[in-house]
Amino acid sequence: MNSERKTATILEDPKINIKIKLSGLWVANMFLFIYVDYFGLYIPGVMEKIIEGEVAHTGIQISQVFLLAGITLMMIPSLMIFLSLTLPAKANRWTNIIVGILQIVVLVSALIGESWAYYIFATIVEVVLLLLIVWYAWKWPKQEA
């Protein structure tokens, strides 16, 4: 008879620092942001409009102002990846809450009139990620003074 005992292995579940959680959520958000725009290039007629100097289905002309606004919008999650890791706790918390809420407003407003399922689905996921950012920042761990 085999008398060997098997011991259960319990996996360690290390606590993840709030700054790393927030930065990771911003990374995921930024990738979705980029991929939504990238896949939008596959929509019939979009490339032709870009070649003509126009944003498809909007009537907006592609100009320096448009591109500056676009890169500024894209820069926000890029900078938040770094800022979430480096800002002091109080500034970090409020920056993530405020920027997260502002990004939600931008994304939801971009949904107006949208009919492509991929865009709607990705935006919902982005909003969920941003809500997690706001939630984690709001619930920032406290320590005794």
Model features per residue range: what roles?
Residues 29-64:
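Hydrophobic transmembrane helix segments
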Residues 128-145:
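Membrane-water interface at the C-terminal end of transmembrane alpha helices
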Residues 76-81, 102-108:
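Hydrophobic, membrane-inserted alpha-helices
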Residues 92, 105-122:
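Membrane-helix boundary connector in multi-pass membrane proteins
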Residues 96-107, 122-133:
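Hydrophobic alpha-helical segments of small multi-pass membrane proteins
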Residues 2-33:
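Cytosolic juxtamembrane helix and N-cap/initiation of the first transmembrane helix
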Residues 74-94:
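Juxtamembrane helix-break-helix junctions at the cytosolic face
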Residues 11-21, 42-45, 64-76:
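Hydrophobic alpha-helical transmembrane segments
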